[in-house]
């Protein structure tokens, strides 16, 4: 809205780089990708490399660190996150060749509200019937390990990237994040993830307050439950479940007014993307 009305995010960043990105004005693009994923089938088992793996094995590749907030899950919905304790690379390769790769992966029942960080090198997959909010580095470098023998639109097996994935993998399990909870005058703040390239918090807002961003970097607010009016810079927006707003770096405080108890996820970059 305001001077940015009608612009795509890419165009807005190009035209108002300093206002939106603040001290990150040198970034080539907006430093976060935030989206909902609603899995209507089991998604492919994949892994993303870290910066070190890209530098060593994949010149031109880009690291990807991502986190998931489980929004909804059907009965039996699950997440595959990391390898089972005690597993080795050799075990994994044998299982992969036999089409039994899931036996080597940690399967976790998906519970709304739980949060998982998929650090670079973590093998992961989203199961059917699970809805997540995904916050990540904007990167297309993905290596697919297993895709349940599915075919592409031409009837061919979908491409796998086993060799690249094995060079990127970390053979370790992943657990749900334990939030650091702080009671406030307006409700409750949960510090969820502090990764090298982003931070995530969850705000349970019971009454209106002025949110001081306390950083010269942009932030993304996503309403998970309830409704919220945000005011700042002479503008006002009403947000419902699933709706989001980017708070530019130049806007140092925002007035938040909930309609009943409202839950909001916030994320912001912490380093230049690609350094994690």
Where are these regions (language model features)?
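Transition-metal
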Residues: 1-87, 147-175, 200, 273-276
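Active-site glycine-rich loop that binds ribose-phosphate moieties when present
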Residues: 87-117
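An exposed, glycine/acidic-rich loop-and-rim segment of catalytic or binding clefts
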Residues: 104, 115-117, 122-177
């Amino acid at each position: 809205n305001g001077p940015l009305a009608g612009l795509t995010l890419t165009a807005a960043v190009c035209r108002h780089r300093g206002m939106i990105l603040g001290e990150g004005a040198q970034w080539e693009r907006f430093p976060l990708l935030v989206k909902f994923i609603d899995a209507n089938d089991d998604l492919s088992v994949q892994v993303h490399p870290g910066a070190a793996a890209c530098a060593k094995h994949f010149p031109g590749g880009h690291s990807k660190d991502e986190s998931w907030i489980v929004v909804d899950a059907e009965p039996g919905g699950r997440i595959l996150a990391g390898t089972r304790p005690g597993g080795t690379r050799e075990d994994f390769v044998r299982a992969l060749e036999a089409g039994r790769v899931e036996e080597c992966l940690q399967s976790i029942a998906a519970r709304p509200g739980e949060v998982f960080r998929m650090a670079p090198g973590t093998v992961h997959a989203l199961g059917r019937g699970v809805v997540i909010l995904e916050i990540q580095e904007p990167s297309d470098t993905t290596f697919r390990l297993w895709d349940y023998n599915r075919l592409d639109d031409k009837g061919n097996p979908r491409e796998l990237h086993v060799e690249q994935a094995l060079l990127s993998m970390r053979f370790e399990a992943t657990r749900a994040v334990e939030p650091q909870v702080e009671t406030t005058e307006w409700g409750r703040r949960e510090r969820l993830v502090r990764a090298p390239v982003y931070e995530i918090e969850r705000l349970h807002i019971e009454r209106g307050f002025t949110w001081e961003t306390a950083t010269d970097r942009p932030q993304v607010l996503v309403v998970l439950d309830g409704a919220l009016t945000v005011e700042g810079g002479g503008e006002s927006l009403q947000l419902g479940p699933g709706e989001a707003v980017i708070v530019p770096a130049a806007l140092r405080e925002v007035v938040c007014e909930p309609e009943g108890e409202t839950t909001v996820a916030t994320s912001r970059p912490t380093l230049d993307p690609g350094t994690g």
